[in-house]
């Protein structure tokens, strides 16, 4: 075994101090065999003796064992090295158990290479030795090394345990290695440990991280024993894969079984509520959080702050933020992002200043929110200032999000040529989000030349995204380029591009209702459509006129109007007007960008019904009130 590079030291002195520091020994200890054992251990440093003289002192080995465990808990690498040297000098290099504890101590201290040296020098290894090394590599995010040593373990004929497989599965989860996951699943089935609590939980967690949610569900449902961690992992898996409704249903199922709730489960459920704009259920979850004692937990608080902001309740979001005593950078970024999404620049700037006064240094996420709010509110010079500030003052390199925001800021201000020049100066290949920002601005200013440049790039980067074709067709329509519209439609058909089906959600009486374009499955759809017909007549008196020029189906105008009335956000709005009290705002979430016609419809609805309407689409929040929208008709 390799000896650690360490000078000879008085192990008695540092061991006593170390044990006192770790609260194993009292500061005044007159008795205890432990003190005697320290003296025995130290005596080896004081005189040259043969190890056999102390062969009866078994407690000496136990003391080294105990000190190493304390080293692991406290990250004390110097003490661990001293014990390593003592192990070599008193000829305990063949003690597998002691060496396993030494490997673990080096591991917990962050000294991976030293741990590997001890492992490689072992004359004999146990299952614990292999498991400790696999766990070490997994904790240090060294996935390849974890898989390699597992393969080495199998090649040497060692039988693995449930702990081995669960650790290797955790390693695969970092890079979402689906192939390795399948192999390990087969291996666990072959060795009859696939239904083990820890293996099953690790398997479903990995499948979910790899986007294989059906496989994760299959593993979950096949497990006879499930812990709170298992349930939490499955709920989180649904949320990671954007199956938010399924996450809420599973959580309710767990509640009926009176399972213990932890902060990770609660955060996942809160996240599901925020992405469904399910404010009522979100409030209920917040109450559960406070009752469970997690209200002051900064991790959970960040989820609650985000939920209220995404549901359009900024007041509640800020109250929760204010109540957290120890705020971290994530929490600051969450509240700043919340106000930015609602286009509240004044509050964003104030929070940014307070954040710095609190000793927090802004990061890339912070500047994404700052640039975003500048784009939503037309603050061109402020946007330029922040873009420069992040580089010169904070040494942050702008990423895709920052460049996309800057293109959006310039484009919204009509500075399309400058936005295009910025894109050409980007030190990496511009992404779809960057070209998409330029194309959206071209629609507003009817700039056909740059629109075609941006669209061509988008067709290359996102050949299956029908939204880009639709947006270009809208620009052609605005410029009365009917022949180009026909070509665009033909290209759309020839490429067999599938448009993402529009969906909208609305939370009514503790239940999330989902509407798709052309909805027919909702139990009250006939009543909704009848009410919609009557409302359209009413809204026309307030200036609403169907924007048939943006409906690209090659049909008669009457049919185009009919198709526009089938949009999911209109159906969700009508259902909300039917079911919610007149004093309640209507909150809707949409999975796509709200179309021009629906935007005009919402404006007319807010004026005709005197209701406050909030629509959260894929890009931003729209607050409709008295015939106006917070976006200023630019989105």
UniProtKB/Swiss-Prot annotation:
Q: What is this protein called?
A: Pentatricopeptide repeat-containing protein At5g04780, mitochondrial
Gene that this sequence comes from: PCMP-H16
Coarse class of the primary localization is mitochondrion
- Give the region (Type E motif) as residue ranges: 434-509
The UniProt entry annotates PPR repeats at 60-94, 95-125, 126-160, 161-195, 196-226, 227-261, 262-296, 297-327, 328-362, 363-393, 399-429
Upper lineage is: Eukaryota, Viridiplantae, Streptophyta, Embryophyta, Tracheophyta
Q: Where is the transit peptide?
A: 1-38
Q: Which GO terms describe its biological process?
A: RNA modification
**Sequence segments annotated as region (Type E(+) motif):** 510-540
Q: In the record, what terms sit under GO molecular function?
A: RNA binding; zinc ion binding
The source's domain of life comes to: Eukaryota
- Similarity remark: Belongs to the PPR family. PCMP-H subfamily.
State the compartments where it is located.
Mitochondrion
Q: Does the keyword Cell wall biogenesis/degradation apply?
A: no
Which Pfam families does this one have? DYW_deaminase, E_motif, PPR, PPR_1, PPR_2
């Amino acid at each position: 075994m390799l000896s650690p590079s360490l000078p000879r030291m008085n192990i008695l002195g540092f061991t006593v101090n170390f044990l006192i520091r770790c609260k194993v020994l009292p500061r005044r200890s007159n008795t205890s065999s432990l003190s005697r054992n320290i003296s025995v251990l130290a005596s080896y440093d004081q005189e040259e003796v043969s190890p056999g003289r102390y062969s009866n002192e078994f407690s000496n080995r136990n003391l080294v064992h105990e000190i190493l465990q304390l080293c692991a808990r406290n990250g004390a690498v110097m003490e661990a090295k001293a014990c390593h040297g003592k192990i070599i000098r008193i000829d305990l290099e063949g003690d597998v158990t002691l060496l396993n504890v030494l490997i673990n101590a080096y591991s917990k201290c962050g000294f991976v290479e030293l741990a590997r040296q001890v492992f490689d020098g072992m004359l004999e290894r146990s299952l614990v030795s292999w498991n400790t090394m696999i766990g070490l590599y997994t904790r240090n995010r060294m996935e390849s090394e974890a898989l390699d040593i597992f393969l080495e373990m199998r090649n040497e004929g060692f039988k693995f345990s449930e702990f081995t497989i669960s650790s290797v599965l955790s390693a695969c989860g970092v890079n979402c290695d689906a192939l390795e996951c399948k192999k390990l699943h087969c291996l666990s089935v072959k060795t009859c440990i696939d239904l083990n609590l820890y293996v099953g939980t690790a398997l479903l967690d990995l499948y979910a991280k790899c986007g294989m949610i059906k496989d994760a569900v299959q593993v979950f449902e096949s497990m006879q024993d499930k812990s709170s961690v298992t349930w939490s992992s499955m709920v989180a898996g649904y949320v990671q894969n954007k199956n938010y409704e399924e996450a809420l249903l599973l959580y309710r199922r767990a509640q009926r079984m009176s399972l213990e709730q932890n902060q990770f489960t609660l955060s996942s459920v809160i996240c599901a509520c925020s992405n469904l704009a399910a404010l009522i259920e979100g409030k209920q979850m917040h109450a559960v959080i406070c009752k469970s004692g997690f209200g002051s937990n900064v991790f959970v608080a960040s989820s609650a702050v985000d939920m209220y902001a995404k549901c359009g309740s900024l007041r509640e979001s800020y109250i929760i933020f204010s109540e957290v005593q120890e705020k971290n950078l994530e929490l600051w970024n969450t509240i700043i992002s919340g106000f930015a999404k609602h286009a509240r620049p004044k509050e964003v700037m104030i929070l940014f200043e307070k954040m710095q006064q609190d000793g927090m240094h802004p990061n890339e996420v912070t500047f994404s929110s700052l640039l975003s709010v500048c784009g939503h509110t037309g603050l061109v010079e402020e946007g330029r200032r922040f873009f420069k500030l992040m580089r010169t003052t904070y040494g942050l390199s702008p990423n895709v999000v920052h460049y996309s925001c800057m293109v959006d800021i310039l484009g919204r201000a009509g500075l399309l040529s400058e936005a295009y020049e910025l894109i050409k100066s980007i030190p990496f290949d511009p992404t779809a989000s960057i070209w998409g920002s330029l194309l959206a601005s071209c629609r507003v200013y009817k700039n056909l030349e740059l629109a075609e440049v941006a669209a061509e790039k988008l067709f290359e980067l996102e050949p299956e995204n029908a939204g880009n074709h639709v947006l270009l067709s809208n620009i052609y329509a605005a410029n009365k380029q009917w022949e180009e519209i026909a070509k665009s439609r033909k290209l759309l058909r020839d490429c067999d591009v599938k448009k993402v089906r529009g969906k909208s959600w609305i939370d009514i009486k503790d239940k999330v209702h989902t509407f798709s374009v052309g909805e027919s499955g909702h139990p009250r759809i006939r009543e909704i459509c009848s009410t919609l017909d009557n409302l359209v007549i009413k809204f026309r008196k307030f200036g609403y006129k169907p924007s048939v020029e943006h409906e690209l189906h090659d049909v008669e105008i009457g049919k185009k109007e009919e198709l526009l009335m089938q949009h999911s956000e209109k159906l969700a709005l009508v259902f909300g007007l039917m079911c919610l009290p007149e004093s309640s705002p209507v909150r809707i979430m949409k999975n796509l960008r709200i179309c021009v016609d629906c935007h005009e419809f919402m404006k007319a609805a807010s004026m005709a019904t005197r209701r406050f309407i909030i629509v959260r689409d894929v890009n931003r929040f729209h607050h409709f009130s008295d015939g106006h929208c917070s976006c200023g008709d630019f989105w």
